[in-house]
């Protein structure tokens, strides 16, 4: 066989192999050094990606004309498919998409990657089947349709609708790729799944935070705009802002992000309007220092650090996370007190993560606790109560609180795969 015929045969074999490994409208190119590029046109709503939970994470960059649109870590199936997850293509319809994929560093050569089952099971589709397949899905408590969920975030009430955002991984039922998932309800029992609201960017993934209804347009984003302030978790943890003018369905990130910078591990912003000072207050935690930090602002964009609380108070065993601050009436006295909520992991009364609280006075700058430092008050003594925070703008002056019904001791080990 001459060289020309051999070359032609090799090209034919490569073509047949490529067709066997993907839909004909998806091109898979194996480039060596654990690098694979997948090319397709976004002419359907989703790219369905096969996931194997025990597989190492592959780093995926979504490119259009060479520009990175989104980045995520995905456990692409190697030996078997556990389930499918959707990459939402609706914002990129008609565009030529390139997925630049780097598989795990310990893969020895490109032939390992070529044999992975994910390539032949990727598919473009206009539908994603999210009907429940789990025997143990709660009927009463909120769960995501698919993927991972932990802390409730950014919750607000407006126009008869309760909006719940939450820490969400759209690409597996394990922790990672932190995004704000979104559900809505008119009764806090029956939930409608909405599209994910805020994805990660160059500053990092989207950790916990809060939202407020800016009724008086203090931010300049419009009267009644929804303003979300959250932690950008990249190489460091900084605080960022996004706003919505369609009642929280979509958000635009503020061009001046980050709005608060720190050299500490600071996160989980909670913003409230303080009627006594006519200012916004923001509380967040310096997680490893066991401190709650207090800030004030007139416009939600520019913040002044006012004070701190926490050294030596309450449970100090684990990291502090997800604070909240609210003023409540003291029953039968006509008096009001401030309640500062701080979640802790580990260090709960029955192990793992839990929610503690402090009662005292707050003047917009400093919190003074009524109890002695060694006194710890627990909101719940059970094991399934963490990241408890309240809705903003609740009707009738209520303070409505929701917690994550799980525990970091076993959250990754519950007997489900479609969601956790």
What are these regions (language model features)?
Residues 1-24:
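Bacterial Sec-dependent N-terminal signal peptides
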Residues 24-269, 273-321, 327-381, 396, ...:
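Beta-rich carbohydrate-recognition and catalytic domains
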Residues 385-387:
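Glycine-rich, charged/polar anion/phosphate-binding loops
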Residues 390:
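Anionic-ligand-binding alpha/beta catalytic cores of soluble enzymes and soluble regulatory domains
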């Amino acid at each position: 066989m001459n060289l020309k015929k051999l070359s032609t045969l090799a090209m034919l074999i490569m073509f047949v192999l490529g067709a066997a490994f993907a839909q004909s409208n998806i091109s898979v190119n194996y480039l060596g050094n654990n690098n694979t590029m997948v090319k397709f046109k976004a002419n359907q709503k989703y790219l369905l990606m096969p996931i194997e939970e025990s597989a190492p994470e592959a780093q995926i960059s979504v490119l259009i004309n060479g520009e990175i649109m989104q980045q995520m870590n995905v456990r692409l199936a190697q030996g078997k498919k556990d389930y499918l997850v959707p990459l939402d293509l609706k914002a990129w319809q008609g565009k030529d998409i390139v997925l630049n994929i780097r598989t795990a560093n310990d893969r020895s050569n490109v032939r390992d990657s070529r044999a992975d089952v994910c390539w032949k099971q990727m598919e473009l589709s206009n539908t994603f089947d999210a009907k429940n397949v789990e025997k143990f899905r709660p009927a009463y408590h909120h769960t995501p349709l698919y993927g991972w969920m932990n802390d409730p975030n950014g919750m607000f009430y407006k126009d008869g609708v309760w909006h719940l955002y939450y820490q969400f991984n759209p690409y597996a039922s394990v922790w990672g790729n932190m995004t704000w998932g979104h559900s809505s309800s008119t009764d806090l029992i029956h939930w409608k799944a909405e599209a994910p609201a805020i994805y990660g960017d160059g500053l990092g993934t989207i950790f916990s935070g809060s939202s407020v209804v800016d009724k008086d347009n203090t931010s300049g984003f419009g009267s009644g705009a929804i303003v979300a302030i959250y932690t950008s978790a990249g190489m460091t943890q900084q605080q960022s802002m996004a706003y919505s003018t369609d009642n929280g369905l979509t958000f635009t990130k503020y061009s001046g992000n980050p709005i608060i910078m720190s050299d500490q591990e600071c996160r989980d912003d909670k913003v409230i309007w303080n009627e006594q000072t006519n200012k916004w207050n923001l509380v967040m935690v310096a997680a490893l220092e066991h401190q709650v930090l207090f800030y004030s602002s007139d416009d939600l964009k520019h913040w002044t650090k006012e004070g701190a609380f926490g050294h030596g108070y309450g449970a100090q065993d684990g990291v502090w996370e997800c604070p909240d601050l609210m003023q409540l009436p003291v029953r039968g006295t006509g008096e009001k007190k401030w309640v500062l909520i701080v979640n802790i992991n580990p260090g709960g009364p029955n192990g793992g993560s839990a929610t503690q609280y402090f009662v005292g006075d707050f003047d917009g700058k400093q919190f003074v606790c009524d109890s002695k430092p060694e006194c710890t008050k627990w909101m719940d003594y059970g094991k399934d109560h963490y990241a408890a925070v309240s809705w903003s703008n609740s009707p009738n002056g209520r303070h409505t609180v929701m917690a994550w019904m799980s525990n970091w001791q076993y959250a990754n080990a519950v007997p489900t795969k479609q969601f956790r």
